[in-house]
Amino acid sequence: MAKTSMKAREAKRAQLVAKFAEKRAALKAIIASPASSDEDRWDAVLKLQALPRDSSASRQRNRCNQTGRPHGFLRKFGLSRIKLREATMRGEVPGLRKASW
């Protein structure tokens, strides 16, 4: 199990990403636009750098919903490989069963 503080940190990052998503997108559009002047582009870069570091979506880490485990995460199920196997063995995942050949 991951530490509670790590789970809380990821939740805080998710809130920051949601809060600043529109602002980041607008600034990135100005930076990428060929129509914007160099001065406008530079101002947008400085404003983007002034935003909180954790407001970037790339800072988020996928974690297991049950344990908070960061590795072996399966995006389709939202679980780590270990918890997915346990749930599958109990028959809690519809249409999924252990391979046998």
UniProtKB/Swiss-Prot annotation:
GO molecular function, one term: structural constituent of ribosome
One BP annotation, GO: translation
Keywords: Ribonucleoprotein, Ribosomal protein, RNA-binding, rRNA-binding
Listed InterPro entries: Ribosomal_uS14, Ribosomal_uS14_bac/plastid, Ribosomal_uS14_CS
Pfam families for this protein: Ribosomal_S14
SUPFAM superfamilies: Glucocorticoid receptor-like (DNA-binding domain) (SSF57716)
Record GO cellular component, one term: cytoplasm
PROSITE patterns in the record: RIBOSOMAL_S14
UniProt record similarity statement: Belongs to the universal ribosomal protein uS14 family.
Function of the molecule: Binds 16S rRNA, required for the assembly of 30S particles and may also be responsible for determining the conformation of the 16S rRNA at the A site.
Subunit structure: Part of the 30S ribosomal subunit. Contacts proteins S3 and S10.
HAMAP family attached to this UniProt entry: Ribosomal_uS14_1 (MF_00537)
Record-given protein name: Small ribosomal subunit protein uS14
Record organism: Shewanella sp. (strain ANA-3)
Organism phylogeny: Bacteria, Pseudomonadati, Pseudomonadota, Gammaproteobacteria, Alteromonadales
Gene, per the UniProt record: rpsN
